[in-house]
Amino acid sequence: MNNRERMRASNKLVREWLLQNEYDQIWFKPHTKRTDVVFTQGGKYLATDLWNLFDGICLSTSGFIVFLQMKTNSWAKEKPLKDFVKKINGCFILSFNVTNKLKGCNGKYKVFVRDYQ
């Protein structure tokens, strides 16, 4: 399986996990050659993800916007996620590790989740 196919398979597992856990309006940012221009008070920058951090967004059952960070076979770096949560009021983040390498996976890809608020 090439990287793009693995990413799509991981996204599918995360999407299924989100739906099973009653999240709604799930949207994943497509990874393309084109980047988005993000304008800030200090200038602008190019981003392939939402703020170069998130792979998607969804809504919780409580009506909160939840930012999604997905990785295959590793966890996302915590510092940028924790820094983002500190700056944004009412921010919720779900970080996913889709892997077959941890104990209990038995060679099958499984979804592991960390949350930040």
Question: Model segments located where?
Answer:
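Catalytic phosphate/metal-binding cores of nucleic-acid and nucleotide-processing enzymes, i.e., regions
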Residues: 1-117
